[in-house]
């Protein structure tokens, strides 16, 4: 097909790979993808993004990307924040902590619940039907948890879901309480 693979690592940067370099890096596939889009706003806790690719791609984007041509460079403070975030990941056990929380969530959710396979901080539970997904999300929110329903037409009919985002600032006790709530409601 003469196609090129571009990988969006928005939810992998800071979470997967050595020092948070992403899932493509963790899998050793950096030289097999055309470009990687990494963001600094999720796992890195700052803002901005970068496109990683070949020198040819870099030259192309500099010369033909209208939004790049007509914008100003990011500030020194933005660059410093990203640098400090990467240094933090090298010095702290952030990745082990978040993966422990993900594992705890997956263990504690009832096996009868339709939890999609994921090692990411984003966990998805299928709750078919807009009404059913919305009502489940509301009940979980009323218990104090920020769980969102993703409804059709955003997703295909019959694949409506709950989106759960896990963070390092969630304690194991909070995750256990969330799972207990989910198990009771679903």
Annotate the PLM regions:
Residues 73-91, 97, 101:
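Structural motif of enzymes handling amino- and sulfur-group chemistry
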């Amino acid at each position: 097909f003469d196609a090129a693979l571009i990988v969006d690592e928005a939810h992998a940067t800071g979470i997967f790979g050595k020092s948070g370099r992403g899932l493509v890096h963790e899998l050793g596939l950096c030289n097999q993808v055309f470009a990687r889009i990494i963001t600094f706003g999720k796992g890195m806790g700052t803002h901005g993004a970068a496109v990683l690719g070949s020198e040819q791609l870099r030259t192309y984007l500099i010369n033909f990307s209208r939004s790049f041509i007509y914008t100003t460079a990011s500030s020194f403070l933005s660059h410093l924040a990203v640098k400090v975030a990467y240094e933090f990941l090298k010095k702290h056990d952030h990745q082990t902590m978040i993966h422990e929380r993900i594992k705890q969530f997956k263990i504690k959710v009832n096996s009868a619940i339709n939890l999609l396979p994921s090692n990411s901080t984003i966990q998805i539970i299928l709750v078919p039907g807009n009404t059913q997904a919305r009502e489940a999300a509301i009940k979980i929110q009323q218990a104090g948890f920020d769980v969102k329903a993703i409804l059709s037409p955003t997703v295909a009919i019959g694949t409506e879901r709950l989106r759960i985002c896990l963070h390092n600032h969630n304690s194991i006790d909070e995750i256990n309480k969330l799972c207990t709530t989910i198990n009771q409601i679903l």
